[in-house]
């Protein structure tokens, strides 16, 4: 890893830390690339059986680094020989990023519009990051130690379990800079809080403190700021000692059921159960149950 992302392996738990505390762990292109690499390493490493994502310093992640984004927007305008269209935003305005699924029917950006690097970060960076978390065949926990804004909140919502410090907060900041949701928020937020509440949080773009986030279902647990590392670490260690293949099957079922009807979900359950029934963990755990012993899961 580089200075932007830290990787620590403690037993079977990989901790991935966003490491730009001076910028509240805002997401630059470098950080996004390194984070995707860290997630890939966690997914492919047999010694890793649970993943913990957190932020260095006082923030979890402030979302897109708008200084970098504004620079890319300005570069796009300065490289175009045609002057900006009437009414176009001035150079550096952060309102031209085109999220995946946004209304593109209006056509391409006006002459002098933003550079592709500014427009394409959703498809090139954010979408792969969310898919890497959701498809990770291991539990992924977010330890939200401070503000999680915009894409930072999206990364937390993509995780399987979220534990927040008492002083943490969430902010659907997209509309504040003239954007709609990205980083999977249009998919995860309605499933966590309901469609109506998701619309409210996205449109009003007001901070949600950790206790309120717990009430809304955005997080699973809120703990004292000083207890976050210990509580999240203990949960990660517990999951790392569990039936890893079963956890992967659970994630596969939940992801599949989110886009399919009951009959298809039932068939997916049967398919996954059949595969898991052949695992060493299932057979050993069944034998341990009959002997009234505690099972010892090997993750396979």
Q: What role is predicted for each listed range?
A:
Residues 1-11, 77-78, 84, 88-109, ...:
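C-terminal alpha-helix plus adjacent terminal tail
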Residues 1-58, 70-72, 76-77:
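Conserved CoA-thioester-binding segment of acyl-CoA-metabolizing enzymes
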Residues 16, 20, 35, 53, ...:
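Terminal peptide-recognition signature
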Residues 22, 26, 33, 113-127, ...:
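Residues at secondary-structure transition points
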Residues 39-40, 127-130, 153:
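Short hydrophobic/charged patches on amphipathic alpha-helices used for structural packing
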Residues 55-132, 176-178, 261:
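Glycine- (often His-adjacent) and acidic-residue-rich active-site loop
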Residues 131-247, 271, 275-279, 284-287:
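Crotonase-fold acyl-CoA enzyme core
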């Amino acid at each position: 890893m580089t200075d932007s992302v830290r990787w620590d392996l403690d037993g079977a738990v990989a901790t991935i830390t966003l490491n730009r505390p001076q910028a509240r762990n805002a997401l630059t292109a470098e950080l996004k690339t390194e984070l995707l690499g860290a997630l890939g390493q966690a997914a492919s490493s047999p010694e890793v059986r649970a993943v913990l994502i957190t932020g260095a310093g006082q923030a979890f992640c402030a979302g897109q680094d708008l200084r970098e984004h504004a620079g890319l927007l300005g570069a796009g305008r300065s490289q175009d020989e045609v002057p900006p269209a009437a009414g176009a935003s001035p150079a550096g305005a952060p309102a031209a990023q085109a999220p995946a699924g946004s209304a593109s029917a209006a056509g391409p950006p006006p002459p002098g519009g933003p550079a592709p690097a500014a427009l394409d970060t959703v498809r090139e960076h954010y979408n792969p990051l969310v898919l890497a978390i959701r498809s990770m065949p291991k539990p992924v926990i977010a330890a939200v130690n401070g503000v999680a804004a915009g894409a930072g909140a999206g990364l937390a919502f993509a995780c399987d379990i979220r534990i927040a410090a008492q002083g943490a907060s969430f902010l659907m900041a997209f509309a504040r800079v003239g954007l709609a949701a990205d980083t999977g928020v249009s998919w995860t937020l309605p499933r966590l809080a309901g469609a109506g509440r998701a619309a409210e949080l996205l449109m009003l773009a007001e901070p949600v403190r950790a206790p309120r986030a717990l009430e809304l279902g955005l997080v699973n647990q809120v703990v004292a700021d000083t207890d976050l590392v210990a509580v999240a670490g203990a949960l990660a260690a517990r999951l790392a000692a569990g039936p890893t293949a079963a956890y992967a099957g659970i994630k596969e079922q939940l992801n599949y059921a989110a886009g399919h009807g009951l009959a298809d979900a039932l068939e997916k359950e049967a398919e996954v159960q059949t595969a898991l029934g052949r695992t060493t963990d299932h057979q050993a755990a069944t034998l341990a149950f009959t002997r009234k012993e505690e099972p010892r899961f090997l993750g396979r």
